[in-house]
A protein has these predicted regions:
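Small-aliphatic-rich amphipathic alpha-helix that forms the alpha element of a beta-alpha
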Residues: 46-70, 83-94, 172, 176, ...
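N-terminal glycine-rich phosphate/pyrophosphate-binding loops that anchor nucleotide-derived ligands
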Residues: 1-55, 59
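Glycine-/charge-enriched secondary-structure boundary and capping motifs
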Residues: 77-100, 105-113, 118-121, 179-180, ...
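Short, compositionally biased
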Residues: 146-166
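Glycine-rich anion-binding loops of enzyme active sites
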Residues: 23-27, 34, 67-150
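Solvent-exposed alpha-helices and their adjacent loops that cap or buttress functional pockets
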Residues: 10-12, 20-23, 64, 105-110, ...
């Protein structure tokens, strides 16, 4: 579809959001879809599904430093619609976001849910995946792997599963970072995969030191944590002489483009880097 997305706001469909400049501000738009059996478990609490649907979209706005204005919901009727509505009310209230409209349908098969989030950015340029430069340092706002442990706990029916069920959109951190970063995105599909994507978009090579990455898993599962998604931390680059204005860990440095977009401890990582759509 990239050939159809010729408007500058579409950013070539290579970013997580469209950015439409309106005077001195920008309208930021994003749309994500959750599919039962892929993005959430069959039989999972509909209130948690509603939370995840909203939070994952708001996380895209966070990576642009945008203030949420509202959401539009595409809802396929399910087995417990009142419970979904209760969860939707909870997450919208938590983030101070309004439901502006949408559509409701009935259909057979796995439940498919879509949400469009609209936000406002007051700084220019609005961050994108591209923009990282040779000499920049690579940062992440917090540990990865918590969602992996949460999913395993949910599947086992025992333990702490909040990180998977109810991810957090780091809106305040994104707003504080946006004026300073050279590039930024949220980690939704795995740190290694998303870092590789950012490097490719920026035409550089990311060199990440494995031991510098904060993880929520035991050390023996570090590799799993680096490749698992759903953590929604913010991954960003700053000029080499800049410190992060929010709590974050420096995990590597940006080099000029080499044969591989990503190096892990000096070597291209092997195997699957994360969740491929």
């Amino acid at each position: 579809m990239r050939g159809l997305a010729t408007h500058p706001a579409a950013r070539g469909l290579a970013d997580d959001c469209a950015v439409l400049d309106l005077g001195s501000e920008s309208l930021v738009l994003t749309h994500d879809t959750l599919v039962e059996g892929i993005h959430f478990l069959p039989g999972q609490d509909p209130a948690d599904v509603a939370w995840k649907l909203v939070a994952t979209n708001l996380s895209d706005l966070a990576a642009k430093g945008a203030e949420p204005l509202g959401v539009l919901l595409g809802y396929q009727l399910g087995t417990d619609d009142p419970r979904f509505v209760a969860g939707l009310d909870e997450v919208l209230s938590h983030y101070g976001v309004s439901l502006l409209g949408g559509d409701t349908v009935g259909a057979a098969g796995p439940q498919v849910l879509g949400l469009t989030a609209l936000g406002r950015a007051t700084h220019r340029p609005v961050p994108s995946r591209a923009g990282s430069r040779h000499g920049d340092r690579i940062w992440i706002t917090g540990p990865v792997g918590a969602a992996l442990l949460g999913l395993e706990a949910l599947q086992a029916g025992d333990g702490e599963s909040t990180a998977y069920r109810r991810p957090q959109a780091l809106l305040a951190q994104g707003w504080a970072l946006a004026p300073f970063v050279t590039a930024m995105m949220d980690v939704s599909d795995g740190l290694l995969l998303d870092a590789s994507r950012m490097a490719l978009a920026s035409c550089v090579t990311f060199a990440i030191e494995q031991a510098s990455v904060p993880i929520a898993t035991p050390e023996a599962r570090r590799d799993d944590a680096l490749r698992w998604g759903d953590d929604y931390q913010l991954l960003f680059t700053l000029p080499g002489n800049h410190e992060s204005p929010v709590p974050a860990n420096c995990i590597g440095i940006v080099h000029e483009r080499g044969p591989a977009p990503l190096l892990l401890d000096g070597k291209p990582p092997s195997g699957k880097l994360g969740y491929e759509h």
